[in-house]
Regions:
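His/Asp/Glu-enriched, well-ordered alpha-helical/loop segment
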Residues: 2-3, 11-99
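C-terminal cap of metal-dependent C-N hydrolases
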Residues: 68-70, 87-127
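Short, surface-exposed loop/helix-turn segments at secondary-structure junctions
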Residues: 1-7, 107
Length: 127
């Protein structure tokens, strides 16, 4: 209903403002996924949250990417297993046609994703 959408939009704005204040205060922000009502991001489409961190919170593209990788792993206590590309860790990575360190929006363009590796195994190869 319309009232629910309005309330969700107001909540979303307040949520973004809160994240922005925390980021500006130096709080580590971890990107996660969950469904939070009408404005929630569908599972598997959370790359849009990287754009929100850049365009609405004020992070650089690499800070946003770190929020979804290294910082998220630290928040989960899994930094020894995932979150960065290091010897002995699970190799979860994407190869994209573009430079997400300059423009994170490339990560939500499914046609730009050339290769997906999960735990060191190729899961998708479009090269």
């Amino acid at each position: 209903p319309e009232y629910a959408m309005k309330k969700a939009e107001e909540s979303h704005k307040a949520h973004i403002a809160s994240i922005r204040r925390a980021y500006q205060a130096g709080v580590k922000i971890a990107l996660g996924t969950d469904f939070a009502g009408p404005l929630g991001v569908a599972h598997g489409d959370n790359a849009i949250e990287l754009e929100i961190l850049v365009n609405q919170v004020g992070m650089s593209p690499m800070e946003a990417i770190a929020s979804g990788t290294r910082i998220a792993a630290e928040a989960l206590g899994l930094e020894e297993e995932i979150g960065t590309l290091s010897a002995g860790k699970q190799a979860d990575l994407l190869i994209v046609d573009g430079d997400p360190s300059q423009d994170v929006s490339i990560l939500k363009q499914k046609t730009a994703i050339e290769l997906v590796m999960k735990s060191g195994e190729v899961a998708v190869d479009r090269r």
